[in-house]
Amino acid sequence: MMKQKIKMLIELLKEQEPDVDYSNIIEFLCKYKKGDFIYPMAIQRTCKIDSSNTFKILELCKKVKLVNTKFVLRCPICNCLGDKYYSSYYAMPKYSNCIHCGKENILHYFEVIYEVV
């Protein structure tokens, strides 16, 4: 199933930019299994691509049902991520306390990540 989704992703990528070599991105994505989280910054760092292209690729991954979008709160004080993942922005609490430093965290500080399905 995963190989079929990767194959569909490659086709979509080639439609958009036929002359680009996507092998490093495909290799990166193949390391993940169902339930793993993919962080956009990890793709940028590992594959050496900018954030705009990273999110374009991740949106194509969503299109072929390779990943789902998740939201997680990030503490503005200690910069740590929370331990709860939300399926939408509106599902997140408006206020919560950081599990690491205890400071109040408001909804403005969050990160978009992707869960492999």
Locate each region found by the language model.
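Short amphipathic alpha-helical interaction segments
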Residues: 51-57
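Long, charge-rich, low-complexity intrinsically disordered regions
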Residues: 1-14, 41, 45-46, 56, ...
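Generic detection of long, well-ordered alpha-helical segments
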Residues: 15, 19, 47-51
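Positively charged, polyanion-binding regions of nucleic-acid-associated proteins
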Residues: 18-37
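Residues at alpha-helix boundaries and short interhelical turns
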Residues: 33, 48-51, 65
